[in-house]
Amino acid sequence: FNEHRFNIVLACRQSGKSISACAYLLWFALFHSEKTIAILANKGATAREMLSRITLMLENIPFFLQPGCKALNKGSIEFSNNSRILAAATSGSSIRGLSVSLLYLDEFAFVERAAEFYTSTYPVISSGKDTKVIVTSTANGIGNQFHKIWEGAVQGVNEFKSFRVDWWDVPGRDEDWKKQTIANTSQLQFDQEFGNTFFGTGDTLINAETLLGFRAQPYTETLESGDLKVYNKPIDKHDYIMTVDVSKGRGQDYSTFT
């Protein structure tokens, strides 16, 4: 996180992503003076729970590292070096008017109206040249703001640095654990919760695993500055039919044309 300003982490369930982020936030506050750190989660209670974890860490670090605290409550911690950590739910007004040095967005794929929130928050982020952003989440459908940022980071079209934590990266998880987990749930649930796989939000006639197995043929050329891909040239005097599946406009899925 130190080497990159914008960071996004796709991690499987129960991989320690939140607690690891809490440790980094505490370190950042202790060793950087006059910084404002904001923890925003899909629910205010979740953000406050993360702040309580930071408080517990603070109580258990070596005494010579423990800073003085000017204020400590359920919603914020203010240190003697004038750095502070705030916790709140993700809303358009969460950090409006604040000069934020480090913004942490937890389980961002589960935030309702995430695109609207991100649009209103980005000016606060971009106003500071050194403002850091850390976004973490498990996969939760296709087309939401987290999915868009992640895909952009992987493809190298935005400023985010992508990090991925898979189930086999977690100590104690092996093939036997995988088989037992699938037996207790399902392959689809395992892929979503532990496989870092993005599935559509609704049930489909053909299951998502089969659809994801298909691969498009290579396109032959691009038009419209690369936004339009051409796979085959139209054949003269042939009739063509287009089927359209429109999205509901909730930022959860794409409109598709076949």
Question: For the regions a protein language model found, what residue spans apply to each?
Answer:
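Metal-dependent catalytic core segments for phosphate chemistry
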Residues: D236-D239, V244-T258
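Walker A/P-loop
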Residues: H4-L25
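Conserved Walker A/P-loop ATP-binding site and its immediately adjacent core
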Residues: K35-L56
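ASCE P-loop NTPase helicase motor core
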Residues: L56-N60, L65, L102, F110-T185
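Inter-Walker segment of RecA-like/P-loop motor cores
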Residues: E49-S101
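ATPase catalytic-site recognition across NTP-hydrolyzing enzymes
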Residues: W167-V244
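Catalytic acidic motif of RecA-like/P-loop NTPases
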Residues: Q14, A109-E112, K248
